Amino acid sequence: MNLAKIARKIVEYALEGKDYEIPDEIKEKLNYKAGAFTTIKTLDNQLRGCMGIPYPIYPLWQSLKYSALMAAFEDPRFPPLQKEELDNVKFEVTVLTPPRKLIVNNPLEYLEKIKIGKHGIIIKRGPYSGLLLPQVPIEEGWDAKEFLSYGCLKAGLPMDCWLDPKTEVYVFEGQIFEED
């Protein structure tokens, strides 16, 4: 079952003003709580939308639906996806494990605890938070320090905020589904 293809179908239906009803047999397989993010990229790998549900608060089929619609139509960095763009974009879905807070005595320990290619991160301080998926540092060629710094930036905080003991760092893993 390719979740990226289901995400595309959800968006295709929405562009027609319709609600895609995920078939019951698929819903049954996706009826456990999990976070999910949908990433939409152009064929030349430029980001076109990426949003999702980081925490396991909905059944996966519902997180998938929400994330697909948000990535296509609500990502504030981009205008809503148009029907004419569908042939020129590809969908990717990342299913997230529940985020786990990293406990450290010294923030420099984060550099050892975060595994590039395995972990995604959530940076939190006060009302601010930013999430980066596990595939991002690989795509960007970042090390753990850069990953943390860009996580801070994504949260709207200074790039060195991860060095502040008041900043919380969470890690999660992701299973990635891509279109063929």
Swiss-Prot record:
Coiled coil: none annotated. PROSITE patterns: AMMECR1. HAMAP family: AMMECR1. It comes from Nanoarchaeum equitans (strain Kin4-M). Residues 1-180 form the AMMECR1 domain. This is Protein NEQ441.
